[in-house]
Amino acid sequence: MRILFVNHTFPGDLGPLLAAFAAQPEHEILFASCRGRREFSVPGVRHVVLSPSRSRRLVGDGAGTSLDRAVEMGRQALQAFRLLRQSGFVPDMVLLSSALEQGLFIRDAFPEAFVACFAESLPSDGLAGDGKGLVRHLLQCRQMQQSDLVIRLAAEGATRDLEQRGAVTLPYPVDTDYFSPLAPNGATGLNAGARVLCAVRDAADVWQMLRLAEALLAQCLDCRLVLLCESAAGRESLAELGASLPAGIEVPERLSLNAYRDLLRTAAVITAPAAACLSAPVLLEAMSCGVVPVLAGDASHWPLLHDGGGCLWCGAEELVPTLAGALSQPGRLAELSLAARRTVERYFRRQDVIPGHLALLHQARAAWLRKQQGGTTS
């Protein structure tokens, strides 16, 4: 089978699935990314880098400009995909990130392919003031509509997610060998001046994160806070604050994978203004390193992380006192650290969950083929 991957980076979050498909010699695989180190390679995979937007007239971050830029990048990618087709590479299956400009016209290039997209979590409130976030959400809606299968990788077991139009939810695969604690016993250490990670996915949540950090610092004077935001716009906002941030709050520059892993290994706790602000990769990779999540939200939505899962849950108004209390109890925190690591090893270990992802994709494509041929999908 010919398989085309399309993602922001190479290989990014699709790396475990890519490696699993590449290990099966019957597949011919091409990976198209917007960014990626050209010297990096995966055996059995051909990698191409899609050109960035060439327009110099599209300046700004407003919704209109962001949408124009997305359409232009989608058209440029369409040209690249048509050249692939002319070269003889016509994929049987396309796997791509959903909120991706380069996937906007994937159906125009490969109308006969089975298309599966990996959806992001639904955005937080605040899209009215976040042009890039709004366009990303619109791109995701478009991609979900034109896909034959929608998959959401989450800190949950396998379910069908009715909140995202019947998307299939699968456990996010974590490389537990790489994301592992520094301590031999698997628990993170808790010393004076404990490091606390405050992390959010979207730029719209940065200001809430700042308020949380300042409130925690007022109660725990000796803790060290590190602020992380996954979106480029959010990182830019934090960088602009720079020296104006209170002492004790650190904002790292863009991190390499090793630097990111090492940061997780030195943290005692990870938190966010609300549980929904955290992405599954950051949450689970932190837990795999023995970092204890202290989260505000409804724990019933995260059953694997609830009873005995290594997390502390509370109401939004209790978040700062709960964080302060956790940091004052190193013995209890060490127990939770071990439990957090065990939860990831039990439910999200890459070697255990990826076979299920492969099986689902093969089953979904087989059902799709039967439907295309006029048969039944049962």
What role is predicted for each listed range?
Residues 188-205, 210-213, 217, 226:
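Conserved donor-binding/catalytic core segment of Leloir-type glycosyltransferases
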Residues 156, 173:
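Carbohydrate-associated surface elements
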